[in-house]
């Protein structure tokens, strides 16, 4: 028996940010989490004006860190509780949305302890998150994470990245206004777009994929393959298409999950941005997965959708795509000494990553170590 679910209502199109006024009319106290860039580009002000037009009180917390942590969430909880919002809005990239999701958990269920509900290993079983009442609107400004529809939040505590996973934290609404991703710098557009491509390919090849998640994954892959090079150059239509592809891929992995490539990049997060690491590791993970007949079949299906024939061709196409977009080698991002000093720790942690459970081939710690080394020395 399989399931396909989507909790989030999606609103899209030029100027769709104004929809927030319709939602805010049903609420009295609206708390907005915003990235600095959304404040600078005027979108925070626009959002606050829509809320005020709906006769709701509004408060904003800006400057959410790029690497969200539980310590940061803990530091802002007194302000959140003092304001007592009945609607939470996340305006920014995946980090902002992840913070808003975590705030929703500990605001609605203050009795919960972080360590009870967050987890780092597939061999742990966290306490389920109870029913939460405060609705969340996600308004992504970058086109990659898929956090606007996903049921997960990734937060650091100390140096360790934890996962919060529950349908309770999936946003009630996602507003996809293509004006927002037009503000992305080229490098952010590239890295986040590459993340979408990996989301699509991994969601299509997990052991939990369904015909419904497949449809979203394939459409996202095709859109990114066609439009990302133009998006990096700032083309407005391309930015819009990649923005929608990010959410489609998010719907795909919400249901089908992800795989080994993400496990590797999560534990190497100290080296470079997440999307860039995913792009670097992807061809090596695909080669590793080729021992599975199921994975070979699925890669070949993706290849045919892009106008090629075989799984092996797809791997070469991915390498060429990376090269065209200027994706560096892993060895250009970190010194050999530093890489080797953390290799054992990264490999051990990646082996425990929950997403390994959905990869078409289960790797050993030694095989994970070899994949890291191949990516570095190739």
Swiss-Prot record:
Changing residue 195 to A: Disrupts the overall structure of the enzyme. Lack of acetaldehyde reduction activity and displays weak ethanol oxidation activity. Its EC number is 1.1.1.1. Its cofactor is Fe(2+); Mn(2+). It catalyses: a primary alcohol + NAD(+) = an aldehyde + NADH + H(+); butan-1-ol + NAD(+) = butanal + NADH + H(+); hexan-1-ol + NAD(+) = hexanal + NADH + H(+); ethanol + NAD(+) = acetaldehyde + NADH + H(+). The keyword Cell cycle does not apply. CDD domains: NADPH_BDH (cd08179). Fe cation binds at residues 195, 199, 262, 274. InterPro entries: ADH_Fe/GldA, ADH_Fe_C, Alcohol_dehydrogenase_Fe, NADPH_BDH. The keyword NAD applies. Keywords: Iron, Manganese, Metal-binding, NAD, Oxidoreductase. Signal peptide: none annotated. This is Alcohol dehydrogenase. It comes from Thermococcus barophilus.
């Amino acid at each position: 028996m399989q399931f396909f679910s989507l909790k989030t209502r999606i609103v899209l199109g030029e100027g769709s940010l104004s929809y927030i006024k319709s939602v805010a009319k049903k609420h009295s106290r609206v708390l907005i989490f915003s990235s600095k860039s959304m404040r600078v580009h005027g979108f925070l002000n626009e959002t606050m004006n829509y809320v005020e037009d709906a006769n709701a009180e509004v408060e904003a917390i800006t400057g959410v860190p790029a690497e969200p942590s539980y310590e940061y969430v803990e530091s802002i909880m007194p302000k959140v509780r003092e304001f007592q919002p009945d609607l939470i809005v996340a305006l920014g990239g995946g980090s902002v949305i992840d913070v808003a999701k975590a705030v929703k958990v500990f605001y609605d269920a203050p009795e919960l302890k972080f360590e009870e509900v967050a987890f780092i290993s597939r061999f742990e079983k966290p306490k389920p998150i109870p029913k939460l009442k405060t609705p969340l609107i996600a308004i992504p400004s970058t086109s990659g994470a898929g956090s606007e529809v996903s049921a997960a939040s990734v937060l650091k505590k100390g140096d360790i990245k934890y996962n919060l996973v529950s349908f309770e934290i999936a946003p009630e609404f996602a507003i996809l206004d293509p004006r927002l991703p037009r503000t992305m710098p080229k490098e952010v557009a590239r890295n986040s777009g590459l993340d979408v491509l990996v989301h699509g390919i991994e969601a299509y090849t997990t052991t939990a994929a369904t015909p419904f998640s497949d449809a979203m994954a394939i459409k996202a892959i095709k859109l990114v393959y066609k439009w990302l090079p133009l998006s990096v150059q700032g083309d407005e239509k391309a930015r819009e298409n990649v923005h929608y592809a990010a959410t489609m891929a998010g719907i795909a992995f919400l249901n089908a999950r992800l795989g080994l490539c993400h496990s590797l990049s999560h534990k190497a997060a100290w080296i470079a941005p997440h999307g860039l690491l995913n792009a670097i590791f992807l061809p090596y993970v695909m080669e590793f997965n080729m021992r599975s007949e199921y994975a070979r079949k699925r890669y070949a299906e993706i290849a045919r959708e892009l106008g090629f024939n075989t799984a092996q061709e797809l791997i070469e196409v991915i390498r060429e795509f990376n090269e065209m977009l200027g994706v560096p080698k892993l060895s250009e991002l970190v010194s050999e000494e530093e890489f080797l000093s953390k290799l054992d720790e990264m490999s051990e942690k990646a082996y425990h990553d929950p997403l390994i459970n959905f990869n078409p081939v289960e790797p050993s710690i030694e095989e994970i170590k070899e994949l890291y080394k191949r990516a570095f020395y190739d």
